[in-house]
Each structure stands twice: as structure tokens, then as C-alpha cells.
């Protein structure tokens, strides 16, 4: 990631500006997934925030959102205090009567979708080298072509620090290629067969997620 003095030609890459937050947060969530740090509870927490924000936009007040989280608590182990904190997060800086939520949390999933599709695209184009540009500093995905040009001209320094999954791209490339392949294959017969045959099968060894 960007460190002070690391980009001698482009110090602006160390500063946040419009469009960078979504990609930075999306890249962070993608990193959790690709490195195996993401779990179902965390994923559900992110998706619940998006649902709660939309509920407030549609008119839900503080109490409505609190009840929404309480209803979800049985499955995701969210207690009263956490439900209140989750609700407070949605309403911070706004009004408790609804219609004016704090929408920043929506960028997590939207950013994830954009980053994921960017990764798939560069793998399909056999241009995985472009992934490392994302670690040169804070940027929007729309900036990547321009920064690639600058890098070719020696005006963009390579990133000093890379996470393991970006340093060795073999797993990422394999994963994205496989996920792209799965999207092309439609096997509804197999899916319905397994869903019917496995529905109601007892949980083994007390394992659950």
C-alpha cells in the first residue's frame, strides 16, 4: 500500500479523493475473501448494513431498524447491545425518524463487486500485472489505464508493499479463472438433484456456520 515518500512523482496517491473510498473498502473486503479471512458472520454483517440502509431510505426509523437487527439475532448471534450499535451506525449524522441514513457502509459491497469484476477482467485479458497497480496508492479503477501508462514511462513507482495473495498471483489467477468458468456453465439438473437429496439430512458432528 501507499507509504509516505513512496511515490516520488505522484504524492496525490497518498491522499483520499472522490471515488477512492469505494475501491479501497472493496479491495479490503476482497482481500478478506481471497486470503480466507472472511466468514459467514462477517459477510452477513456487511449485507445486513446494506439492507438496513435501504430500509431507512424507504422510511424505516431507528426503532424499525433496531427490530430488524433483533430479528436477525437468532441466526447471527447478535445481542441487544450489538443490535443497538448496528442501528446507531446506520443513523449516525442523520435523523432517527428515517429517510437520511449514513450511507458510507453501502460502498463495501458495491466496491467489492467492482473490484471482483476488475479482477476477473484482467485475468481474462491475461493482464494480471495490472492488479499490482491497485497497491500503488489510493485510486479509482477508472484510473488504472492512466497509471499503467505512467508506469510504462517510469513515472509511477511499483508498490513497496504487497499482501501475500497479490505478491504471488497464482492462486488468485486460478480462482478467478475457475469462477469465470463456473459462470459459463449451467447445470440446473445437478443443483436441483443435490438440493432434493440433501435437504433434511442431519447435521454431522455438530458442525454449523
Q: Language model features by range: what are they?
A:
Residues 1-5:
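Conserved small/polar residues in nucleotide/adenosyl-binding loops
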Residues 6-54, 111:
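Post-HExxH zinc-binding segment in Zn-dependent metallohydrolases
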Amino acid at each position: 500500500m501507499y507509504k509516505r515518500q513512496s511515490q516520488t512523482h505522484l504524492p496525490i496517491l497518498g491522499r483520499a479523493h472522490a471515488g477512492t473510498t469505494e475501491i479501497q473498502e472493496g479491495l479490503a473486503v476482497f482481500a478478506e475473501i481471497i486470503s480466507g479471512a472472511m466468514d459467514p458472520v462477517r459477510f452477513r454483517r456487511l449485507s445486513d448494513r446494506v439492507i438496513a440502509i435501504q430500509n431507512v431510505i424507504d422510511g424505516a426509523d431507528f426503532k424499525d431498524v433496531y427490530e430488524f437487527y433483533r430479528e436477525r439475532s437468532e441466526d447471527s448471534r447478535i445481542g441487544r447491545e450489538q443490535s443497538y450499535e448496528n442501528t446507531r451506525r446506520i443513523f449516525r449524522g442523520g435523523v432517527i425518524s428515517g429517510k437520511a441514513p449514513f450511507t458510507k457502509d453501502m460502498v463495501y459491497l458495491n466496491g467489492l463487486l467492482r473490484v471482483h469484476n476488475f479482477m476477473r477482467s484482467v485475468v481474462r485479458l491475461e493482464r494480471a500485472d495490472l492488479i499490482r497497480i491497485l497497491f500503488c496508492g489510493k485510486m479509482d479503477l477508472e484510473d488504472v489505464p492512466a497509471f499503467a501508462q505512467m508506469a510504462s514511462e517510469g513515472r509511477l513507482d511499483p508498490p513497496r508493499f504487497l499482501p501475500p495473495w497479490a505478491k504471488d498471483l497464482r492462486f488468485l489467477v486460478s480462482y478467478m479463472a475457475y469462477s469465470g468458468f463456473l459462470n459459463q456453465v449451467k447445470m440446473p439438473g445437478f443443483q436441483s438433484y443435490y438440493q432434493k437429496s440433501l435437504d433434511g439430512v442431519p447435521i454431522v458432528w455438530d458442525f454449523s456456520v
